[in-house]
C-alpha cells in the first residue's frame, strides 16, 4: 500500500488584509503531537498580522507564547471580558475603515488580528459562552482563530 501525501505549505493559508474573511483553525491531537509548533509556524509565516491575543492555560508553566507574542497580549485563563475587548476593538477598527473608505475611497488600516485559545479546557465554561460562538462564527472580523485542544475533551456544540 502506497500513501501519497502532498507537501503542505503554511503560506497557502490566506490571511490577506483585503479579504473579508479569515480562517478558523482547530488543532486536535494528543499531548506532545506538535500542535504548539504548528501554531508557532503559522505565526512565523504570518508575522505581518498587526495584533493578536493568546489565552493559554499553560503559559505560566512553559512560557511558550511569551517568546512569540508580547506578554501584554497573553492571558493565563479564559475570561469573557477578554473576548468582549477583542470584539469591541475589531468593531471599532471596522467602523474606522468604513469611515476612511467613504471619505478617502481607501483605508490604510489593517484589520487583521489573531486569537489563539490554547489548553483552555481545564475550565470548559468558555465552550458554551455566546461570545465564543460569535468569535468562531464571525470570521470576517478576524484573520485567524486557533483552538488547540486534546480530542478527548473537545465537546463543542454549535
What are these regions, as identified by a protein language model?
Residues 71-82:
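Short acidic-hydrophobic, aromatic-tinged amphipathic segments that line or gate anion-handling sites
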Residues 2-19, 40:
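Pre-Walker A adenine-sensing motif
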Residues 52:
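An amphipathic, basic-hydrophobic helix/alpha-beta surface used to engage anionic
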Residues 4-5, 55, 72-74:
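Intrinsically disordered, low-complexity eukaryotic regions enriched in glycine, serine
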Residues 63-72:
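Short, aromatic/basic amphipathic alpha-helical patches
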Residues 48-49:
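Conserved SF1/SF2 helicase motif Ia
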Residues 12-14, 23-45, 57-61, 80-158:
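Conserved P-loop NTPase motor cores
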Amino acid at each position: 500500500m502506497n500513501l501519497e501525501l502532498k507537501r503542505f505549505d503554511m503560506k497557502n493559508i490566506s490571511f490577506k488584509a483585503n479579504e473579508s474573511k479569515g480562517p478558523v483553525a482547530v488543532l486536535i491531537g494528543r499531548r506532545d503531537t506538535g500542535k504548539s509548533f504548528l501554531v508557532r509556524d503559522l505565526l512565523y509565516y504570518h508575522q505581518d498580522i498587526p495584533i493578536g491575543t493568546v489565552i493559554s492555560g499553560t503559559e505560566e508553566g512553559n512560557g511558550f507564547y511569551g517568546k512569540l507574542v508580547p506578554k501584554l497580549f497573553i492571558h493565563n485563563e479564559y475570561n469573557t471580558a477578554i473576548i468582549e475587548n477583542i470584539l469591541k476593538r475589531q468593531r471599532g477598527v471596522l467602523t474606522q475603515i468604513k469611515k476612511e473608505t467613504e471619505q478617502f475611497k481607501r483605508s490604510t488600516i489593517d484589520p487583521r488580528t489573531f486569537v489563539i485559545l490554547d489548553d483552555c479546557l481545564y475550565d470548559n465554561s468558555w465552550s458554551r459562552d455566546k461570545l465564543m460562538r460569535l468569535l468562531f462564527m464571525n470570521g470576517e472580523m478576524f484573520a485567524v482563530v486557533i483552538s488547540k485542544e486534546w480530542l478527548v475533551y473537545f465537546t463543542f456544540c454549535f
